[in-house]
Curated annotation (Swiss-Prot):
The keyword Hydrolase applies. Keywords: Hydrolase. SMART domains: Lactamase_B. It comes from Thermodesulfovibrio yellowstonii (strain ATCC 51303 / DSM 11347 / YP87). It comes from the Bacteria. Gene3D superfamilies: Ribonuclease Z/Hydroxyacylglutathione hydrolase-like (3.60.15.10). This is UPF0173 metal-dependent hydrolase THEYE_A0282. One of its GO terms (molecular function) is hydrolase activity. Belongs to the UPF0173 family. Pfam families: Lactamase_B_3 (PF13483).
């Protein structure tokens, strides 16, 4: 049975009352978002990552999935996307280059990706009958698709990115994807009221705790969820270090610490 953490966000979120939006973290950068109307989005769904000991069960217990959002082409972010898509019929939300590569070389069902669910950085799409708006946001990383049996071992997967997800009668979420700190993050803080930011803190392949804290300051969300840490020993940035940096930089954002497999319900 999944643990549910019920959060009262009267102070943390705007005065207008949200419907219930549920966020589940599966470890690494993998999240499930369930909207107030019951629509299900998965972001970078690698449920069976090494840090998630219940990953196979979580994968089996997934409800119908409406959308799979992929930030870039690396295998630890494509994860279980292909099998989930084949099982549930979930449509793929990705940049055009990334989507085409995943369909052609990784086996994502072709009929589940098209112009309806694709875009590029700075562009916004509205899906699920207006239930969600998704803005494509750039990231500073890489995005090669590794196909061991292909004549080319690395396939071009477009540019890496993140997503700003606005949920009708719910919060606005920013998933950074894998990235370093970059100054244009300030624009998100200026142009949007971000309620929850999912930020990578693991270091080595992304920014670590110090730079992630500065990114949080730039975006200025109400709450932040640290991610992409501890999956492998080399991703050694910690939540404790992130907390320390947030405190030292006098950033007012609340850190929302979710255990792997837990769900937070935002009302």
């Amino acid at each position: 049975m999944k643990k549910l953490i019920f959060l009262l966000l009267i102070i943390l979120l705007p005065v207008a009352s949200f419907g219930a939006t549920e966020i589940t973290w599966y470890g690494h950068s993998s999240f499930k978002i369930q909207t107030p109307n019951g629509k299900v989005l998965l972001i970078d769904p690698w449920l069976t990552n090494p840090a998630n000991k219940e990953g196979k069960r979580h994968l089996k217990e997934l409800p119908k999935v409406d959308l799979i959002l992929l930030t870039h082409a690396h295998g630890d972010h494509i994860g279980n996307s292909i099998e989930i898509a084949k099982e549930t019929g979930a449509k793929l939300v990705a940049t055009y280059d990334l989507g085409k590569a995943i369909v052609k070389y990784a086996g994502y069902p072709e009929k589940q990706f098209g112009y309806e669910t694709t875009g590029n950085f700075g562009g916004e799409i509205t899906l699920l009958n207006g239930e969600v708006k998704i803005l494509f946001v750039p990231a500073v990383h890489s995005s090669a698709l590794e196909i061991p049996d292909s004549p080319k071992s690395l396939i071009y997967g477009g540019n890496p990115g993140g997503f700003l997800i606005s949920i009708k009668n719910g919060p606005t979420l920013y998933h950074t994807g894998d990235t370093d700190l970059f100054e244009d993050m300030k624009l998100l803080g200026l142009m949007y009221k971000v309620d929850i930011m999912m930020v990578c803190i693991g270091d080595k392949f992304t920014m670590g705790p110090k730079r992630a804290a500065i990114a949080t300051k730039f975006v200025n969300p109400k709450m932040v969820i640290p991610m992409h840490f501890g999956t492998f020993p080399m991703l050694n940035g910690t939540v404790e270090e992130f907390e320390k940096e947030i405190a030292e930089q006098k950033i007012q954002t609340k850190i929302l610490k979710i255990k792997i497999g837990e769900t937070v319900k935002i009302e």
